[in-house]
Every structure is written in structure tokens, then in C-alpha cells.
Swiss-Prot record:
One of its GO terms (molecular function) is pattern recognition receptor activity. This is Tripartite motif-containing protein 5. It comes from Chlorocebus pygerythrus. It is found in: Cytoplasm; Nucleus. The gene is TRIM5. Residues 187-200 are annotated as: Required for interaction with GABARAP and for autophagy. A zinc finger (RING-type) spans 15-60. One of its GO terms (cellular component) is P-body. Belongs to the TRIM/RBCC family. Keywords: Acetylation, Antiviral defense, Autophagy, Coiled coil, Cytoplasm, Immunity, Innate immunity, Metal-binding, Nucleus, Phosphoprotein, Transferase, Ubl conjugation, Ubl conjugation pathway, Zinc, Zinc-finger.
Amino acid sequence: MASGILVNVKEEVTCPICLELLTEPLSLPCGHSLCQACITANHKESMLYKEEERSCPVCRISYQPENIQPNRHVANIVEKLREVKLSPEEGQKVDHCARHGEKLLLFCQEDSKVICWLCERSQEHRGHHTFLMEEVAQEYHVKLQTALEMLRQKQQEAEKLEADIREEKASWKIQIDYDKTNVSADFEQLREILDWEESNELQNLEKEEEDILKSLTKSETEMVQQTQYMRELISDLEHRLQGSMMELLQGVDGIIKRVENMTLKKPKTFHKNQRRVFRAPDLKGMLDMFRELTDVRRYWVDVTLAPNNISHAVIAEDKRQVSYRNPQIMYQSPGSLFGSLTNFSYCTGVPGSQSITSGKLTNFNYCTGVLGSQSITSGKHYWEVDVSKKSAWILGVCAGFQPDATYNIEQNENYQPKYGYWVIGLQEGDKYSVFQDGSSHTPFAPFIVPLSVIICPDRVGVFVDYEACTVSFFNITNHGFLIYKFSQCSFSKPVFPYLNPRKCTVPMTLCSPSS
């Protein structure tokens, strides 16, 4: 009787983790007690799997570490229990049949029970296979050991599955949090784009309203004047018809001719079906462009300009700005960039070309370009150029020339990729073009292709991917819209940033990465 009670007490003070009597027991808020070492190991396991909350290994109720308390009462019970030993009589009762009082010496295979010889002869066990305990103990010890090892293996698998699901849970949470952040950022960008598009569209409508109403007001004034003139003429005729014969005939031919030659002037009208139709912006495309710009901006480098000996180009002290200066003695230049197709000569020092070469562009000046001081020989590089308020410029990259104080760029300019120039340009305020290789008939004259640029850029971004052999130009003013991209560039030499303010005195400025 007493032994049964002691067994029950022992079960109550046994650690559910190590299955031994509690050592330095600690109580959780849920009521379960564990060894101090076991609960410490449980904490480390929770940290290993990045669990946000710790939970009881028995009931899985979460708890905070500061709520754990030492259980002095249970510790005292364990100490007393370790001192208690079963008396010989009580130990003897454990080995005797509770029903017959005989020694428990046999094992019933069918019922898997330890029995006495009287139990073997009872109706309950008649016909069953029974063995002496000594005969089967070793066999079942091996089976139990095998089962224990199998169970421990399954426990490891179960713990791994538990850890895997916790890891997957944490991974999903991280992924969803990341997606939520991206969604919020994307919609914020879309809102900015929509606000910009709305403001731009409203400005266009206000401009249209101003132009149309101004024209209609002018027409209205003209119609009022025309009506007033008609009234005065009608009044004159009525007065003549009602007056004397002399008044009737005085200057009658002149007034009749005025009436006969009179033509009603019709007001200028605007057809509503000819108005510009508003179209909602392609938000996905704009967002994709914005993402591409965000990606290339990660490679922003701080570019400064190299010194030069060109009298036409003035570089500021901070080496970020270049502007055109009209010298007293102008260079005898061939003229503007996109003139009519007539013969001209310009200087070029590109290998393989002559010092004076004839082409079919007119009035184009090559002698105001400057290079960046940093060479590009590998990797990805990005920079931005402020071209606001300029009516003409050329920018991009130039290959093969080391810039220094003695470098004369005007002797080395021929804007074709085969000669190491990957550039785009602007002239006359709104005409954008890209410079391509000239034809076989005009190998030293670049082939100039017009570009469609809806919104004129105040800033142009230039991105060079040396390994991919590409040069890209972005319209920063229009959400990073791709203006043009050179592919399969032959970067056999180092390349340098290139800026040409042309004959426009407004400066070009290299923007700092922090701008």
C-alpha cells in the first residue's frame, strides 16, 4: 500500500524531460515543474529555432522567463523521497500475486502479464503460453531496447519535423513581411507617380484652357467690332433713305461698294473631337522603369571633370560643371549638329581617319567636349547630368583617350561607336537624337537617328555595364524612362564620361550621389 503511494509520489516529482527525479526544480506559470538544467536546455533550443515565445514542453502554454520560480516545496519532497527505501515486507509484497498471494514467477504471453502458478491454472489463463520470467526476460529486454532505440529515432525525426515547421513558419513570416514592405513601397511609388501625372495633366489642361479662351476672347472681340460696324452702316443707310435727295446721293457709290464687298469674318473655332485625349498612364510600365532606375542607381559613382586645353569649354572649380564660352577668335567650325546635307570638313584625330575629313553634316562644332577624370575598365557605373534650361548638349561616354591637361579633345571627336563614342544629343530645345555609325559611303560622318522624348529631361542618367557592353540613358524627369540603350559596345579600351555643352551658355552639371 505504502509502496504504491510512494510510486505515485515519485511520478509527480519526476522531470518530464529527463525522466529523473527533479533536480533544482523550477515551476512554470502553467503549474508544471522541470529541472533547472532541462529548462535551460529548452530555452537554448527555442533560441536556436528563433522562436519568439517560449512554451512549456508538456502543455505548450507560452511563458516569459521572468515568470519562472524555484519550487522549494517540490525540492523538499524530492529530498525526502531519496531517503525513503521500501521495507523488506513491502518489497516482498510487490513480488507476490495480489489475488493469490503466491510469488509472481511466470509470464503469460497472450495477456503480457506476470502471474503466479495459481493464475496459470485459472480459467482466465488456461491454454495460454506461459514461461518462467527468467526464460523470457532477456528476449523482451532486447525487444524493449530495440523499441526504445526506434522510439528515440522517431523522436529525433519528430523533433526535426517540429524544427522544420517552425523554420518554415519563420521563413513564411519573413517572406510575407518582405512582400508587405514591397507592396507598401510599390503603392507609395504609384501614388507619387499618379500625383505627378495628375499635376502634369492639370497643368496641360490649364494651358489648353488659357490658349483656347484667349483665342476665343480675341474672336469674340472681333465679332463685337464687326457687329458694331454693321450697326453703324445700317444706321447710315437708313438715314440716307429717310433724308433729302442730296443726302441720298452724296457718296452713294462708295457706300454701295462697301456693302457689296463686305465679307463676314467668321470666328476661329476649336473642334472638341480634335482635342488631345487623356489616357491613363501605364502604371505597371512606369513602375518597372522606376524599379530599373532604382536598381542602376545603386552603382552611382562620384564623377568629376578632367582639366583640358579647350578655350571654348569652361570647367568650374569644383570640377562638376562645364559651360560654353564664346572666344574672341572662333574656331572655324563646320556648324550645327543637324543641318542640311552639304559638304563640310571637321577635324578628327581618331585612328584610321584623316586629319581633315569631308562629311555631309553642316555647322557642327566638335570642340566643346570634356571628359570625366575617372576611367571605367570594369563593373557597373552610373551618374546623372543636370541639363535643365539647356537648348543643346551632347553626353555619354568616350573610349580610348586618357584625359589630362595636354589632351586636345577637339582633335579626337567623331561621334560614332566605332570611334569610341556612345552619346546622345539635343539641339534647338526639343530635338533629341542618338549618334550611330555612319554608312560605308560616309564612314566619317555619324548617322543621326531622332529619338522620341515626350517629356524633356532636366536630368539625364547614364549607366555603363562594362562586362555586358551596354550604355543606357534614363530620363530622370520622367520617372526614369529609358531614352536609349547602346548594346554590344566594343569596350576594348577604358571609357570615360563625356559632356559637351555645345554653343549653349547654360552649364551642364554632374550631380553628386547625395543630390
